[in-house]
Amino acid sequence: MVNLFAWASIGENGKATGGKKGDQTKKEVKVAPYYEFGQTWVIRFRSTSRGKKAGKAAKLLAENDNIGYAQDDRVSLYNECERINWDIDRINEIRKCNCDCSLLIVCAINFAYGKRKLSSGYTTHILPTICKSCSKNFKRADNSLKTKKFKKGDMVGKSGHVIINV
């Protein structure tokens, strides 16, 4: 079985910044098979059901063409998710906005809990710290990088990029 992941990667202008709101190319935020990019860590939900819900949310977010990519406007997705009260059933109500890879993950985590769990300030550089600050909710599962046996909601990344198993 192919592991499908969601991620946000590059704006329609081919850059990390300056993109228009919304997915202009259908490739800015997407779902696709797992790929190698030098991953060094895996963060796993301790609760399987929360992991599945985060994976579902990430997939719905990635398939919503109102969500595009631009690091300089990344918080606009977070603001839209706050507007719909982190209700996974209302993801289709999100208006045109942007995110980056880490904000997509943060929003998926918050949807898994149905509330603000993580702030919009998390980036790929500090995302692994949730295993320490929220150890009752998350754990490291770095051995999965070798086996490629990922669970729904697994966040796979390195400093600079992260993807989530959907």
Place the predicted regions along the sequence by residue:
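Intrinsically disordered/low-complexity terminal segments and short unstructured peptides
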Residues: 16, 24, 122-123, 128, ...
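Loop/turn positions that initiate beta-strands
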Residues: 152-154
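Short, surface-exposed loop and linker segments with low hydrophobicity and enrichment for Pro/Ser/Thr
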Residues: 1, 148-149
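Short, basic/aromatic beta-hairpin or loop at an interaction surface
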Residues: 114-138
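Short alpha-helix capping/helix-loop boundary micro-motifs
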Residues: 136-148
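Short, compositionally biased
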Residues: 162-166
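N-terminal capping segments
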Residues: 1-117, 159-161
